[in-house]
Each structure stands twice: as structure tokens, then as C-alpha cells.
Regions:
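S-adenosyl-L-methionine
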Residues: 2-123, 152-186
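Conserved class I S-adenosyl-L-methionine
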Residues: 121-131
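Short, glycine/acidic-enriched loop or turn micro-motifs at the edges of active sites
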Residues: 130, 153, 181, 197, ...
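Conserved SAM-binding loop of SAM-dependent methyltransferases across substrates and taxa
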Residues: 132-144
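Conserved SAM-binding motif I beta-strand of class I
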Residues: 145-150
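S-adenosylmethionine
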Residues: 185-253, 260-264
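Core SAM-dependent methyltransferase catalytic element
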Residues: 255-275
Length: 275
């Protein structure tokens, strides 16, 4: 058996989902440990390699050390597993641009967020920086009225096409322009923002202040709720200090067999009229 210790797990992270059911909390906050068979220990090391949450890199220690052949085999299995990922759009004919292919919120997750918004009493959503429309479609399919703002004309055309493909074009108003400039003109109970992270976002420290237009929208929300999709590595400590109990941070795991233990993003909710 190998003792596996993982340090740096945030308090808001469901550790059993991330690490597995055999892990127990250690004496220090964020520390977890388990006694695992060699293959299971190698699998955990492979899955967590290079990951960071809340602005801090995870530290994984395995004693006694794993053999090189076992490590290589586990990493090969993990690479194959990553190919089975939660799909973006599931209907044939959806349109993307290059950014949309890797930044699109999976369809199942976007629809869950839409239904959650309905349960919160939200009626109207402003999707500020809608991209190719994944989140807008999730809200619209849940029955909400959506204003989708995007500054890239090609991307906005993709979003409009995808809304038509899913039969919700009549629930979405599409606006070409700057999200910050148009935010306060949008009739909405909820601001939603999925800022561009960059395809190779830094895994150990991303400040929300660097995720434009999110900081500006926080100032402009004027009592509205603000939800955001941010990278798992985002350090939200300054927001936690500022917003206190009105801030909820929820890690979002994949829904497919290959990514069900992988955090796809953080769903950040700043309470307002739609708390």
C-alpha cells in the first residue's frame, strides 16, 4: 500500500468527488490522505498532476514512491480518459469559431444553470460576452428571457444560428457591442459572465481582476445577482473578503465518464435580487 497525501484542497471543494471515497481529512486545513493500492495511488497522482485551485497548486506526495512504469501507465490511462469529455452542443449543425470550440460550456451544465436560475426566481438574464451562445441557450431552454451581448460579429452570428437550431431564438435578443457599455441598458435580473480565459490559462494563480469584463460588471450590477464561470485556478480570496456570505463558489465537475472527477470550471454566484 502507498500513503497518498494531497495538500491545497480548498474548503469549498467536495474532496470525495475530486480525490475519491478513501481519502480522509488531515490535521491541517486543505490536507487529505489515504492508503491506496499501487495502481490506485498512481491514478490519483496522474489525475491531479499540475492542477491548482483557488490560486494554489495542489501538492501530491506518495510514499513509498511509485515505480516509473506504473506512473507512465497511469498517465497514459488518464490521457485516454480525458478524450471522453462532456460535450458542448449535442445537436448536429451547431456552429463554432476557434475559441468557441474549447471555451463552450457543456450543454448539460448550461441547462442546469438555467434551471437553477428559474428556481431562484430569475426572469431575465443578460449574458455579457455570450460567445457562440452555449450559456444563453441554457438559460433560454429553461424558459428565461435572455439578452446576449457579444462584441465579435462572427461569434454572435454563430450564437444566433445555434439558438435557431435549438428552437429558442425567440427567447433571446442578440446585441453586437461591448458588454460593459451595454450592461446597464439590458433589462435583466441577473448578469452572467463567462470571460475569456485563454486556451492555456495559468493553472496556479488567476486573479478575477484579470478576467475582463468581470471586475467592471461587479461594479455595475446595482443590486442584480452576478454569476460567472471562471477557471478552477482563480484566486477569489479578495472577492470572498469583500462579499462575504453573499458569494458562493461551486466547482463544476464533468458529466461524462472521462471527466466526472475533473473540475471543468468554478461557478461563482454573487447574490443580489436573484439570490
Amino acid at each position: 500500500m502507498h500513503r497518498v497525501e494531497v495538500d491545497g484542497v480548498p474548503t469549498w471543494m467536495p474532496a470525495a468527488r475530486l480525490l475519491g471515497p478513501d481519502f480522509e481529512a488531515g490535521s491541517s486545513p486543505g490536507c487529505w490522505h489515504a492508503a491506496l493500492a499501487p495502481r490506485d495511488a498512481a491514478d490519483v497522482e496522474a489525475r491531479l498532476r499540475g492542477l491548482g485551485f483557488g490560486g494554489r497548486a495542489l501538492e501530491v506526495r506518495v510514499t513509498p514512491p511509485l515505480g516509473r512504469a506504473l506512473v507512465r501507465a497511469a498517465r497514459a490511462v488518464d490521457a485516454r480518459r480525458r478524450r471522453d469529455t462532456t460535450p458542448g452542443f449535442t445537436r448536429a449543425g451547431a456552429r463554432f469559431d476557434a475559441e468557441g470550440r474549447w471555451s463552450l460550456t457543456p450543454e448539460a451544465i448550461a441547462l442546469e444553470w438555467g434551471r437553477f436560475a428559474v428556481g431562484c426566481g430569475v426572469k431575465r438574464v443578460a449574458d455579457l460576452g455570450c460567445g457562440v451562445g452555449g450559456n444563453s441557450l441554457g438559460f433560454a431552454r429553461a424558459g428565461l428571457s435572455v439578452v446576449a451581448v457579444e462584441r465579435d460579429a462572427e461569434r454572435l452570428a454563430c450564437a444566433r444560428h445555434n439558438a435557431r437550431l435549438y428552437g429558442v431564438e425567440d427567447r433571446i435578443t442578440f446585441l453586437l457591442g461591448d458588454a460593459v457599455a451595454l450592461a446597464t441598458t439590458c433589462p435583466a435580473d441577473l448578469f452572467f459572465c463567462d470571460p475569456p480565459w485563454g486556451e492555456h490559462w495559468h493553472r496556479t494563480a488567476v486573479s478575477p481582476e484579470a478576467l475582463s469584463p468581470l471586475p467592471a460588471l461587479l461594479e455595475l450590477r446595482a443590486g442584480r445577482a452576478l454569476w460567472a464561470k471562471v477557471p478552477p485556478s482563480a484566486d477569489l480570496s479578495t472577492w470572498s473578503e469583500r462579499l462575504g456570505a453573499s458569494l458562493t463558489i461551486e466547482p463544476v465537475f464533468g458529466r461524462a465518464a472521462g471527466d466526472q472527477q475533473r473540475v471543468k470550471c468554478l461557478w461563482v454566484r454573487c447574490a443580489g435580487a436573484a439570490a
